[in-house]
């Protein structure tokens, strides 16, 4: 059932496609410095934040297993593995996808078979 499947993803992670996006109007909306959860960023320092956008099917709001503010461990990307925080939402056309927030000028990249796993190691209590 769906609940068991969501619990499995939360416990074991899942495979996703990883891409990147930049806080610029043509890739976001008219307020590229404000993320979906309301966080305001300095666009020129976007790469320093370690924030990600996730496809809607991964967010609890749309039946997924992640929430804004959750920390995920990303593996399988060669040079982008690490812990990121969920802060933004991708366009509805994407499924099972993670977008890493990068500063303007960073060369685009894509990883087809990366894995995300929810972690609370870095969550502040």
Task: Give residue ranges: language-model regions.
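Solvent-exposed, well-ordered loop and adjacent helix/strand elements within mature globular domains
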Residues: 1-125
């Amino acid at each position: 059932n769906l609940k068991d499947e969501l619990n499995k993803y939360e416990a074991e992670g899942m495979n996703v496609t990883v891409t990147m996006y930049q806080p610029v109007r043509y890739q976001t909306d008219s307020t590229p410095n404000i993320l979906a959860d309301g966080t305001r960023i300095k666009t020129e320092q976007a790469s320093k934040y370690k924030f990600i956008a996730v496809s809607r099917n991964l967010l609890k709001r749309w039946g997924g297993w992640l929430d804004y503010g959750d920390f995920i461990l990303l593996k399988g990307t060669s040079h982008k593995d690490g812990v990121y925080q969920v802060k933004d939402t991708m366009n509805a056309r994407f499924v099972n996808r993670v977008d890493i927030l990068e500063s303007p000028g960073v060369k685009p990249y894509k990883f087809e078979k990366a894995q995300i796993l929810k972690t609370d190691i870095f969550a502040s209590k």
